[in-house]
From Swiss-Prot:
Family of the protein in this entry: Belongs to the DNA polymerase type-B family.
Oligomeric form and interacting partners: Component of the alpha DNA polymerase complex (also known as the alpha DNA polymerase-primase complex) consisting of four subunits: the catalytic subunit PolA1, the regulatory subunit PolA2, and the primase complex subunits Prim1 and Prim2 respectively. PolA1 associates with the DNA primase complex before association with PolA2. Interacts with Dpit47; the interaction inhibits the activity of the DNA polymerase and occurs only in proliferating cells but not in quiescent cells.
Record organism: Drosophila melanogaster
Subcellular location: Nucleus
Motif CysB motif per UniProt: ranges: 1362-1388
Modified residues (Phosphoserine): 239, 262, 269, 317
The EC number(s) this enzyme carries: 2.7.7.7, 3.1.11.-
Protein name: DNA polymerase alpha catalytic subunit
Domain of life, per lineage: Eukaryota
Biological process according to GO: DNA replication initiation; DNA replication proofreading; DNA-templated DNA replication; lagging strand elongation; leading strand elongation; mitotic DNA replication initiation
Domain comment in the entry: The CysA-type zinc finger is required for PCNA-binding.
Any single Gene Ontology cellular-component annotation: nucleus
Signal sequence coordinates: none
Length: 1488
């Protein structure tokens, strides 16, 4: 068989003598001996006796539907079976050629004739397929039962399927899947981590149970149904065996009795490619094309009897901790099928009576809206459902463009375009628009009127009054826009507003439609030619005929929607390098109520369709395995084209309102749309609800027009915080699943699972299981109810809310608010002026909002106080302001309408007066806050039903999210309501409030150890929980009485706090339960152990160290335990006890691997490129790449020795080995060192010693770091000895002009004979030389000057060295990237760069030179007497050095910085006139 379905299959050859004919020969030889064939059950008719016409008809049915296109047109039946063709099994080359000539090709067939080919070998040979099967061990005795071929024949004769099943199980042994080893690795890693962290021995029985677990047991536990009570009302459908999609015979059966999801209406096999056909499994076909009514009844009765029979207990019983939802999904399909009767009736009901009269009123629930401003301008499509479940498409036409023409103050001269003295009137504007703009746009008619509007925003290049008269113009929305270029100047029109507003926005604002709601439509027409796939489609020419339904009393709930969850499996085609679909699972619910708690399970119909990857063939035991598979309805197709055609047919019947998927751009919806378009599947637009002919290209969501798309991954990124947002992590964090309850299937595992039929059924179950997890995640996170509430609050569309467009939500909220207040809204920014990032990628936090064109923040963000680093074992009180920025906006009435933009962008605007009317922005926030308070009051009501409780909770969450994100639109540069001056004013008041609160707390004699934007950490110095809360209440009352809207509250109490630096801390958070007992819970922020780009080994060790540091032991015992843990992990790594998965490092690709410019220093990029190239992986932007650092026999850097874990496992001759030194020095050591660096009693060198590393490197780096930190700190102690101060300085060297001997000068004197001392300038160091240095004093002075210049030049060369012990890279250049406030090393990318020669070093060196010539500071007990000439010489050299020192500003000490903390405390006291001292002269800096 060929490797690719696109190549013709080679002819079969009779080369296997031990095959079918050899078996028949053995059967003949056994005839007449004692080994007789005994058939237990007498069979009347083994073969049917028919005439030649009937035989030809049956043979045609058998072969025609399998591989002949167009139902066999052009072919003639030769009345032979395939095994009668001797030429097909001929050994000779000539026989093969003759057989090809005999077969021929029909003239009308589309099949191309086969070319002469050489005998296929290797994987392409059919031998390879059979050789993969596990051979059966032969017995010594020969009997009929032992003959496989005879057993197959008898199995076909017998009617009992059990005998065939038993025999097939003996022939085809189940193969173990490769994912088992990975599961064992994960289990071992999990067990090791638990034992390391908890130090608790696992029970022997549980450990044996974990070791005995396998994929088969897990899937049996998942798939085998529990014993259920029989239910006679269960509706049963077609058998979940493989369906070959035959053409049905025309029967007079009624349409209403057909299964809406049956595949008998269309033959998708005709869409299969010829090369993709596979004929072997046809000999084992289990279903006939047509069945009689009696046979169907018998089948139904047998199924009922089978379902009603009590289930036998299975050995693989599920765990007690398994959730009920999972058991309903995969263990109890009978209860799910119970809902299918209603499902079928509802679907058929919606298809009937879909016509509607134009005289009637149409009332429907609007879900989604769509417009195409290019192809259909001025039109909007609304999609929804009626109360009886019919899908509706409303086409609204004639939505006019609305322009607001701002008049100039004076008319412009038509020629010079300079202002004249003539004032502009509304008539002037009308005339210019009629004569110039209307003619240019070719307007046949337009309407205009004079209106008074307000404008409160900033327009670039023009000055717009806050309120004035405008000319409002309405014209056909299909006409183009007026000329808005900057070069175009109108004589009377200063600016045209509203030109960029699209039809959908105008329609929603004019009709006051805020999200999904009930709409009532009158005056419509039924479309004669439908443009949609909905049950009901009407066209409306008057937009005003769309009205909101005003119900008296409680509003009517929304109708149930139809939900469809999709999960797609893909494989890479190595020839085309494209992802091809090989499996699609579908879960659907046709009555999913969004305003009620989600049903359990969240679907009432399920099915799965599959085809084979291009590089594999169907396994021989597939039909047998699928006959036993009862977990879902499976549809098998022989090509991707047939699969997608079937999918579109089912998709259209379901007519879903909501599509649920996970990471739609990752081989899910994108692959479906790409392959449907690429394969040219007819009517591809059925993916959406509009009948379209042209694809949208890369605009994925527009293929699903009219249907909401819920991407669970994207919604989870907005709803929760997680280490990663892949499906495995979300299932573990949200659904509380265990590692054994989900299996990840990668590309390699997928191909291996297609080798056996049993593995394919497992793959189907895993695909269905993942699909059910998507629905559970959507329901657990309340994605749809929350999106509905947010959309109703903001007034945008559901699709944009589900896509995470936070900026657009706020934009529509303000659009509705300003429109209701008769304001002109700002124009949309052109797309060309925006960055490529969408709303979901934009930072909307406000404090971090930056212009991408600028290198620094456009305005100052939130205030972050300098932390007092250390370990706090007394209780620390955490307090924060509730919704600080929204409260500031309300407190100071900050709005577009109340605050004027300053002329200078760097200046802060002035706050409005207290008598100013509240602005629109504060009013909207007040409405949101008060609404949330009212909802929370309703939640506190007793006897509240679960449905109302859920609705109130989701409502208050939506109000909170909307209010907290309102500030974001002010600071987001690409927002339509961007107002930098307002955002800067809000953050300025936030910094001011935090500073005032800090000072107030300090006045109460409490230390604020840290503060960040809206929170404070206060050290109480006590360990009484209740007393700490009393202190918090006192602080709260003192602060809150200063403000009206701002509210400071207690956020928690830390029993122990490890404060490392800004935004990095760990703490034990205390809380009391209902019984008054204290509960301890760890809280981490910014630490390495919460980041995913560290290995699990480093994270595990870091957590163990953190547990010890935050424990209640004394500090010495903590450090001893930490050191013991490190020595233990060092030993276990050396012994190979640590499981391999713990060494895996995970990093995310921020772009496509090919787009990285310098991938050599990025290990995850190297691994992604290599795996994509060599192992057919599909790593792309946003994916997480796992790798390990190995020793590969090269001298490359560690970052260039990264390999995937699979590469390490499959390495030949153990060429790859783990680099344990890398993990000790680059993973464990830095993580632990950063945690304990603030503790006294340990340091980096001690940690290195515990890990078996060289501690000297870390001591040197610690000294360098200490020197730099000492240099940067202004308060270094000056009480040092001369030896301590100048121990690293170099002595002064000069050369004698006579003997050329180098003179070494460490002080003014050098030792002489008999313990005496001699002045250095008095005598040459060489005793034979008679020339004293004082005689060439000028030369000595010049050499001193040159020496000082060398030291200065050395400093300005700015040589840097990496502080990482394994790097020590020297360089003079550095990047702007910082690490710990120092430049990042570009070589290792893990260390920071330190100066080799710092300002402190230079200053000490110069001071040392000056000290040499200062005779008064020499500490000799008996100083020699010097002549006046020598004293003057020393004084001259002293002044030379001192003059150099005076030119340096390093000698100036800033007392304001030195005593900053003391001055801050003094500022809190009543001000007293004090002398201001800024600096002191250099003389004080020289005190020793």
């Amino acid at each position: 068989m060929s490797e690719s379905p696109s190549e013709p299959r080679a002819k079969r050859q009779r080369v296997d003598k031990n095959g079918r004919f050899a078996a028949m020969e053995r059967l003949r030889q056994l005839k007449g001996t004692k080994n007789k064939c005994k058939v237990e059950d007498q069979v009347d008719d083994v073969y049917d006796v028919v005439d030649e016409r009937e035989y030809a008809k049956r043979a045609q049915e058998k072969y025609g539907d399998d591989w002949i296109e167009e139902d066999g047109t052009g072919y003639a039946e030769d009345l032979r079976d395939f095994f009668e063709d001797e030429d097909e099994y001929s050994d000779g080359e000539e026989d093969r050629k003759d057989s090809k000539k005999k077969k021929g090709v029909a003239p009308n067939s589309k099949k191309r004739p086969r070319e002469n080919e050489k005998p296929v070998t290797g994987k392409a040979s059919i031998k390879n397929l059979f050789s993969n099967a596990v051979p059966k061990k032969m017995d010594v005795k020969t009997s009929v039962k032992d003959d496989d071929i005879l057993a197959d024949i008898l199995g076909e004769i017998k009617e009992e399927p059990a005998a065939t099943s038993e025999k097939a199980e003996k022939v085809i042994a189940p193969a173990k899947i490769s994912v088992t080893s990975r599961k064992f690795d994960a289990a071992a890693a999990k067990e090791y981590m638990n034992s390391f962290l908890n130090n608790i021995k696992v029970q022997e029985q549980e450990r044996k149970k974990a070791e005995a677990s396998s994929d088969n047991e897990m899937l049996e536990r998942i798939l085998k149904p529990k014993a259920a009570v029989p239910n006679t009302k269960v509706a049963f459908f077609s058998s979940p065996t493989i369906k070959k999609e035959p053409m049905p015979e025309k029967t007079p059966a009624k349409k209403a009795t057909e299964d809406p999801f049956s595949d008998n209406e269309m033959d998708f096999s005709c869409l299969d490619d010829d090369e993709n056909q596979f004929d072997v499994e046809k000999t084992q076909q289990t279903e006939k094309v047509s069945q009689t009514k009696t046979a169907a009844e018998k089948t139904s009765q047998s199924k009922v009897a089978e379902k009603s029979a009590p289930k036998k207990e299975t050995t693989g019983s599920p765990k007690e901790s398994e959730s009920e939802d999972i058991s309903r999904l995969l263990n109890n399909w009978e209860s799910i099928c119970q809902m299918d009767d209603d499902f079928e009736k509802s679907v058929l009901t919606t298809e009937q009576d879909s016509t509607i009269s134009s005289d009637q009123q149409l009332r429907f629930w609007y879900w989604e809206a769509y417009e195409d401003p290019v192809k259909m301008p001025g039109e909007v499509f609304l999609f929804g459902r009626t109360a009886d479940g019919k899908s509706v498409c409303l086409r609204v036409q004639n939505i006019n463009r609305v322009l607001y023409l701002l008049p100039r103050q004076f008319l412009l001269d038509p020629i010079s375009k300079e202002p004249t003295k003539q004032k502009v009137t509304v008539a002037d504007i009308y005339k210019e628009f009629d004569s110039e703009v209307a003619n240019q746009l070719k307007l046949e008619f337009f309407r205009s009127r004079k209106v008074t509007k307000s404008f409160a925003h900033h327009a670039i290049g023009i000055e717009v009054p806050q309120s004035c008269d405008y000319l409002e113009v309405h014209y056909d929305g299909k006409k183009p826009l007026p000329n808005l270029s900057a070069d175009k100047k109108y004589n009377s029109i200063a600016h045209i507003f509203g030109a960029t507003t699209n039809a959908l926005e105008r329609f929603l604002l004019d009709r006051k439609i805020k999200g999904p709601c009930w709409l009532q439509v009158t005056g419509f027409k039924v479309s004669p030619t439908p443009m949609s796939w909905c049950n009901t489609e009407v066209t409306l020419t008057e937009p005003k005929n769309v009205e909101l339904v005003q119900d008296k009393g409680k509003p009517a709930p929304p109708p149930p929607l139809t939900l469809l969850s999709l999960n797609v499996r893909t494989s890479m085609n190595p020839k085309t390098s494209r992802n091809e679909i090989c499996m699609i699972s579908m879960l659907t619910h046709n009555r999913f109520h969004i305003d009620r708690p989600a049903p359990q399970p969240a679907f009432n119909r399920h099915m799965c369709a599959l085809t084979r990857p291009a590089v594999v063939s169907w396994p021989l035991d597939l039909n047998f395995e699928m006959a036993k598979y009862k977990s879902t309805t499976v549809h098998k197709h022989d090509s991707e084209r047939a699969l997608l055609s079937w999918f579109l047919a089912q998709y259209q019947k379901i007519d879903a309102d909501l599509i649920v998927t996970f990471d739609s751009m990752d081989c899910q919806l994108n692959v479906i749309t790409d392959q449907i378009v690429a394969l040219k599947i007819p009517q591809w637009s059925r993916m959406g609800r509009l009948r379209l002919s042209q694809s949208f290209g890369k605009r994925l969501l527009e293929h699903f027009v009219g249907r909401m798309v819920c991407d669970v991954k994207r919604s989870a990124e907005e709803c929760i915080r997680a280490r990663s947002y892949d499906l495995q992590t979300l299932c573990k964090q949200v659904l509380k699943l265990k590692e054994s309850e989900r299996m990840e299937v990668n590309a390699d595992d997928l191909l291996e699972m297609y080798e056996k039929g049993e593995s394919i059924t497992k793959l189907i179950s895993l695909t269905m299981q993942d699909n059910s997890y998507l629905l559970r995640l959507m329901c657990e996170l309340n994605i749809m109810p929350l999106a509905l509430q947010i959309t109703n609050i903001c007034g945008n569309t559901m699709t944009r809310t589900l896509q995470g467009g936070r900026s657009e939500r706020n934009e529509f909220l303000l659009l509705h608010a300003f429109h209701e207040k008769n304001y002109i809204v700002p124009d949309k920014k052109p797309v060309s002026k925006r960055s490529g990032a969408g709303d979901t990628d934009a930072t909307l936090s406000g404090a971090d909002a930056t212009m991408q064109t600028k290198k620094k923040a456009a305005y100052a963000g939130g205030l972050v106080l300098e932390p007092m680093r250390g370990l706090y074992e007394k209780y620390v009180l955490l307090m924060d302001f509730n919704s600080l920025y929204p409260s500031i906006i309300q407190e100071y009435n900050i709005c577009f309408t109340t605050v004027q933009q300053p002329v200078d962008a760097d200046e802060l605007p002035t706050l409005p007066d207290s008598k100013t009317e509240p602005g629109i922005l504060p009013l909207q926030l007040k409405r949101l806050v008060e609404s949330r308070k009212e909802v929370k009051k309703l939640m506190a009501a007793p006897d509240l039903s679960p449905e109302l409780q859920m609705q109130y909770h989701i409502r208050q969450m939506a109000l909170k999210l909307t209010a907290n994100s309102m500030y974001g639109c002010l600071g987001f540069a690409h927002s339509r309501f961007f107002a930098q001056h307002l955002a800067a004013l809000v953050t300025h008041k936030g910094r001011e409030i935090l500073t005032n609160t800090q000072q107030l707390v300090q006045k109460m004699n409490y230390d604020v150890v840290y503060g960040d934007t809206d929170s404070l950490m206060i050290n109480t110095n006590i360990t009484d929980y209740d007393q700490v809360y009393k202190i918090g209440h006192n602080i709260k009352q003192s602060v809150n009485k200063l403000y009206k809207q701002l509210e400071l509250d207690i956020d928690g109490v830390f029993g122990c706090l490890l404060l490392l630096k800004k935004k990095k801390y760990a703490a034990i958070k205390l809380s009391k339960d209902s019984k008054g007992n204290l509960r301890r819970e760890q809280e981490h922020k910014g630490l390495d152990i919460v980041r995913r780009d560290w290995s699990q080994l480093a994270v595990m060790v870091g957590k163990a160290v953190l547990d010890e540091v935050l424990s209640e032991k004394p500090l010495e015992e903590k450090l001893d335990a930490v050191h013991a843990q490190l020595e233990k992990i060092k030993t276990q790594i050396a012994e190979g006890v640590v499981p391999l998965p713990l060494f895996v490092i995970t990093k995310q690709l921020t772009r496509t691997p090919q787009e990285y410019a310098n991938s050599a220093s990025l290990p995850h990029v190297q691994v992604a490129l290599r795996m994509n190239r060599e192992r057919n992986r599909r790593y792309k932007k946003g994916d997480m790449v796992d790798y390990v650092i190995c020793l590969d026999g090269t001298t490359n850097a560690a970052m260039q020795r990264a390999y995937h874990l699979d590469e390490l496992k499959t390495s030949e001759d153990k060429k790859l080995q783990l680099d344990t030194n890398y993990y000790l020095g680059h993973q464990i050591h830095p993580v632990v060192t950063r945690m304990v660096e603030v503790l006294e009693g340990t340091d980096a060198s001690r940690i290195a010693e515990c890990l078996g590393m060289d501690p000297t490197k870390f001591r040197q780096n610690a000294q360098r770091t200490q020197r730099e930190n000492t240099e940067q700190s202004e308060g270094e102690s000056l009480l040092k000895t001369t030896l301590q101060l100048y121990r690293l300085c170099e002595p002064f060297r000069f050369q004698c002009v006579t003997c050329k001997t180098e003179q070494l000068m460490a002080s003014a004197y050098r030792p002489g004979p008999s313990n005496s001392h001699i002045a250095v300038l008095q005598q040459c160091a060489k005793s034979e030389c008679q020339t004293a240095p004082i005689q060439y004093l000028a030369s000595v002075r010049n050499q001193l000057q040159l020496s000082m210049r060398q030291y200065v030049q050395r400093f300005y060369k700015n040589w840097l060295v990496c502080d990482h012990p394994d790097c020590n890279f020297n360089t003079r250049t550095h990047s702007l990237r910082k690490k710990s406030h120092r430049p990042l090393c570009q070589k290792c990318r893990s260390g920071s760069l330190l100066r080799q020669y710092t300002e402190r070093d230079l200053y000490n060196q110069l001071c040392y030179l000056r000290f040499m010539f200062d005779l008064g500071k020499q500490t000799l007990q008996q100083k020699p007497t010097l002549t006046p000439e020598l004293e003057q010489a020393y004084q001259l050299l002293y002044e030379t050095v001192d003059q150099q020192l005076q030119s340096s500003s390093y000698v100036i000490i800033s007392l304001s910085k030195l005593f900053a903390r003391s001055l801050a405390q003094m500022s809190l006291q009543p001000s007293v006139a004090q002398p201001q001292i800024e600096a002191i002269p250099s003389a004080l800096a020289d005190v020793v």
